[in-house]
């Protein structure tokens, strides 16, 4: 949805769920996905979502005009990022290949560096920097440990899987009204009882009379 002279820019290969809200100065890159109930509100500043990044269901992404020093505070999310369900990103930067867990909050001016992970439910306070390759958690979030090799590999797998998953949802969401009606007709046909099948079960005889009404 546009807001004044600010219009969202969504790549043709991206998926934005029908119930998601993308408002104002927001760009969404190729292969990225914005899931059901998510809100991206670029009103007083801009939101940039890179490529192959997933913003999962119920997440809120917002911005701030500037901090007390006058520095602009957009929200920038890089490539191959996973943002879990119901996370909150506010005027922050999430670099390439990072993961923000479900229900986590990232506040103004915070930076989650590339290849790092924020645990579910954590609060990353304003101005905090989460270093690459680290796991942070808690409220306020603090360094917990370095990521294992398996966890580092999972960061890429998570983004890849969501990019693939989104394509099926995009195919359905992009269907025309006529195609949806045709799908409904086909589904109705597939759920109709076949007389020959009923005869083979002995539910009806060849005259069409039902023999075992309790089986229908």
Describe the role of every protein-language-model region.
Residues 1-31, 202-216:
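Extended, small-residue-rich solenoid/repeat segments and analogous flexible loops
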Residues 82:
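Short proline/glycine- and basic residue-enriched helix-capping loop/turn segments at helix->loop/beta transitions
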Residues 1-5, 9, 43, 51, ...:
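Glycine-rich hexapeptide-repeat left-handed beta-helix
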Residues 10, 14-55, 59-65:
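A positional/architectural concept
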């Amino acid at each position: 949805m546009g807001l004044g002279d600010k219009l969202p820019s969504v790549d043709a290969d991206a998926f934005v769920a029908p119930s998601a809200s993308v408002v104002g100065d927001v760009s969404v890159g190729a292969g990225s996905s914005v899931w059901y109930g998510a809100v991206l509100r670029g009103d007083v500043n801009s939101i940039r979502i890179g490529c192959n990044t997933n913003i999962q269901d119920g997440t809120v992404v917002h911005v701030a005009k500037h901090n007390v020093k006058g520095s602009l505070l957009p929200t920038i999310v890089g490539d191959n990022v996973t943002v879990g369900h119901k996370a909150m990103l506010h005027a922050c930067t999430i670099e390439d290949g990072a993961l923000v867990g479900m229900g986590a909050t990232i506040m103004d001016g915070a930076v989650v560096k590339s290849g790092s992970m924020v645990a579910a439910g954590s609060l990353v306070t304003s101005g905090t920097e989460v270093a690459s390759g680290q796991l942070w958690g808690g409220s306020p979030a603090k360094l917990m440990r370095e990521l294992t090799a398996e966890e580092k590999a999972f960061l890429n797998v998570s983004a890849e899987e969501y990019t693939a998953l989104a394509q099926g949802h995009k195919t359905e969401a992009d269907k025309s009204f006529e195609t949806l009606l045709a799908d409904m007709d086909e589904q109705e046909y597939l759920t109709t009882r076949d007389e020959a099948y009923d005869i083979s079960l002995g539910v009806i005889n060849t005259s069409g009379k039902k023999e075992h009404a309790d089986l229908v």
